[in-house]
Each structure stands twice: as structure tokens, then as C-alpha cells.
Amino acid sequence: MKETGKFGFWSIVLLGINGIVGTGIFLLPNKAYSIIGSASLGVLLFDAVIAGCIALCFAEAASLFTRNGGPYLYAKHALGDFWAFEVGVLKWIVTVIAWAAMAVGFATALGAAVPALSNDFAKDVISGILIIGLTIVNIFGVNVSKFVNNLITISKLVPLALFIAIGIFFINGANFTPVFPQDIYVDGSFAQAAVLLFFAYTGFEVIAIAAEDMKNPKKNLPRAIIMCMLLVSVLYMAILAVSIGVLGTDLANTKAPVQDAFNAIVGPIGMYIVLIGTLISMGGINFAEAYYAPRVATSMAEDGMLPSALAKRNRYNAPYVAAIVTAIASVLLAWSGSFTTLAAISAVSRFTQYLPTCLAVIIFRRKWADKARSYTIPGGYLIPVIAIGTSLWMLAQAQTNQLLWGLGGCIVILPFYYSYWKKKKAGLIKDHDEM
């Protein structure tokens, strides 16, 4: 693929922001405030730091590779084929589940805005069209995908930027005191709020999955991951601060905090601006899933871990077979509605991306001490160790059923790994030389 057709630095940043900023930011101010009051600003900053530690590990690992795969690739070279298989397959499965859920979420939100589209048949049609439409966009290659992603991401940020720029003049300082309201704060509130808000920062881990579609990924990916986290952190802090400053204690009782706050500032037009922003944001997250999901399967197929057909590309260099298979699975899940239970796997799966990558940074420093890196985390092993500890702590917060579903997912795919292992042992599969 020509370098001119690939994602440049700022397009990678926008791709990352699109993968992180979803509909959650339109709802989180209410949930966070109801748990811990205006101290939620401190919790959000705390989460930015700990999520940032994990993101820095991804940045350093990304500086060593140019292939697609991201966390799967890091696990393969640091921990071996078995853990790579578990990380890669679970990531692909969970992305399919997440895409189905997000497509239905978009259809549901559109139905709420347009009552005529709120019936089950309309939701099925809308979710199906959305998944198929975004798949077609991706099949036309990186140039088209880059343009669509840039357009969607900027469009989703405009309503949020307007909310912040206008809302900052309507902040009431008295709404920030007391920091810990007596009728809200109880023991354990900080941890509860920290877990809730942490997931608002997740999504950065998928940026490196499509490294081959990016200009100079060893240099640009680490910088883009760091820039994404900085911009998203500032955005989240500003949105929460304006929401608290405008609504005060009413923030704990509203179901649409950003929408209600903007309505209080500029009237009904503010509510509609946020509604449009919410729909665009949901569409953006769907696009991100459509873009990343096939590339996980393609990278594994190139290594012989999945059927070789999934590695096929068309004249636009798009992984069209993997894209079609992913889309079919997502549509069927969306129409069945069975993704709700399966989504429990995602809580555990996310940390199967984090832990191996954080460990990989430490292993790569020893294994490839002389290998050139465009980025190295300062402070020695301190930040990777903090990131590992954070991942374990967050995993410990998962519900028992989520842990069981995650463990079940790991076990179910074992026979497929055994099949791969037998073929590799027989010399039928060779390792991919490129990194």
C-alpha cells in the first residue's frame, strides 16, 4: 500500500479518539456524581493516570512492530503462541459481540428520537443496514475508511466542544462544594466510581491493531496513543466540570446529564445538538468496531492460527473475507439479541489485552535490549509494574459471572488451539517473519 493512502499522525489520533469516546461520556457525569459527588473530578483524574500507565505500555510495545495485530502480536512475541491465540481469538469474538450490541444501541437510540422506528422490526433493519454499510465502506480500503473516520470523529466532537465552550460561562462555583456530600459518599464510593469511570478511557488498546494501515507506525503509533489519552482526558474533565457547574446536585437525578445541562444553558436547541451528537458518537463507535475487528482475524490468519482465507485482501488491500465473516456474525448476533449474556466476556477480555501487553514491555526490554525503539517509558519498570497492578485490581472488581464467562471463553477455544499446534508441530505452518 502506498504511504500516501495510509493514516497519518492526526488521522491515527482521530481513529483513537473515535475508539475511546462513545456514548458513555453523555451518561457518565450523572453516574459518577451520584456515587461520589463533585469529588468525581478527582476520581476521573486518578483514572486518567492509571489508564495512562497502561496506554504508555501499549505505546512502547507499538514502537517495535509494523504488522497488524496489536495486543495479539505483543503476546505472541513475548509469551508464545498459546497466550497469543487466547488474546487474539477472544479479542475478535468480543469485538463481534460489542459491534452487535452497539449496532442495536444505535438503532434503539434512533428509535427513541423517531418513534416510528422504535419497533423490533425497524431496529433489526437499521442495525443490519448499519453493519453491512460500514463493512462495505471498509472493503473499499484505507483511503475511504480514513476519510469517513475523520469526518465522523470531528462531527462527534463538535457538540461536545460547543457544550464546553458555552457551558464554561454558566458554571456556578458553589456547585462544587462540599466535595464529599454527606448524603452521597459512603465507604467504597471511591473504588466504585473509579471502576465505573475507568472504562470511559478504554479503547486505546485497539489503535495498534491496524498498524499496517498507518504511516511509519513505529514512530507515529506511540505518539498517537499518548496524544489520544491526553486529549480525551482533558475532554472528559471539561465535560464533567461543566456538567457539575451547571446542574449541581440535580446532576445525580438526571438520566441525560449533558443533554439536560445544555438545555438549561441554551434551551431546547442544546438538547437537540447533544441528541445529534449522541447518534453520531454511536455511529462512530460502530465504525471503529467495523474497522478493527477484521484486522485481528487477518493477522492471526497470516500466522496460521485461523483459516488462511481470512487473510485474503482485495485490490484495495482491505481484508474483505475477514470483514464479511465478521459482519455476518455481528448481524446474526444483533438480530438474535443473545449478545447481552455473551457481553459478560468483554469485562474479562479487555484485561487479557492489558496484562500481556504490560508484561510484554518488561520482557521485550530484556529480550530485545539492543533493538531500536522510537519510544521508551521513562522511570524504568515503575510504570509497567503500576499498569500490571492496575489491571489485576480492575480484573478483581469484575463480577463472578463475568469471570466465569471469561474463563469459559478461554476454555472453549482450546480445541482450536490444539488443532493449530498439531499442524505447526507437523511443519504445516511456519512463523511469520515480519514484525
Predicted regions mapped to residue ranges:
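Select transmembrane alpha-helical segments in multipass membrane proteins
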Residues: G5-G16, G80-I93, I126-L130, I184-L197, ...
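Membrane-interface "cap" regions at the ends of multi-pass membrane proteins
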Residues: M1-N30, S34-A39, L45, A51-G52, ...
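Helix-loop-helix junctions that connect adjacent transmembrane segments
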Residues: M1-E3, L41, L45, L117-D124, ...
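Hydrophobic transmembrane alpha-helices that form the core helical bundles
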Residues: K31, I35, V43, G52-I131, ...
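Membrane-interface loop-to-helix entry segments
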Residues: A122-G173, I184, I225, M229, ...
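TM-loop-TM module centered on a large, flexible mid-protein loop between adjacent transmembrane helices
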Residues: L73-Y74, G80, G111-A116, I226-E289, ...
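C-terminal membrane-solvent junction of multi-pass transporters and transport-like membrane proteins
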Residues: V148, I184, A309-Y320, Y354-L403, ...
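Alpha-helical transmembrane segments of multipass membrane proteins
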Residues: A109, A113, I132-I136, I164, ...
